[in-house]
Amino acid sequence: MEFDPDAVRSLLRGQQIATLPELKGALGSSATMTVFRTLKRLGYRTSYSHRGKYYTLAEIPRFDARGLWTCRAVGFSREGTLLATAQRFVDEADAGVTAGELHELLSVDVKGPLVRLYRRRRIDREDLGG
């Protein structure tokens, strides 16, 4: 059975972001894979905040100079995931960046992603304590 991607396109153009249950409702399908096939066909982005549970069309975000876009307190990044976003900010910071600075910038807890990046040897860590 073929599902009409216009239902998803219309929903997302109207409210800008949606969750998987909302997208399933728009398509009239309970199948997760049907939603993801439709999103892939349309081109989409996943939120870095809220554990990636929000979706938008790739054409919708208007990213700021930092590569971030927020809609109704849901964060999206050019990099996509929180892990990739955190790594970019660390990599681009000449003097490094603290977890607190990243938290303030991204409005989400970044300690877990920073630990994962460190354990994977993708970032270094310095103790700034006196």
Task: Walk through the language-model features, giving the residues of each.
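Eukaryotic partner-binding/assembly regions in large regulatory complexes
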Residues: 1-53
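Positively charged, polyanion-binding regions of nucleic-acid-associated proteins
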Residues: 1-16, 78-94
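Short acidic, hydrophobic short linear motifs in intrinsically disordered regions
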Residues: 17-26, 93-105
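Short loop/turn and capping residues at structural boundaries
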Residues: 23, 50-51, 101, 113-114, ...
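Short amphipathic alpha-helical interaction segments
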Residues: 29-38, 106-119
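Charged low-complexity interaction tracts in eukaryotic proteins
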Residues: 40-80, 119-130
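Phospho-regulated, low-complexity intrinsically disordered regions of nuclear gene-regulatory
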Residues: 60-92, 100, 105-112, 116
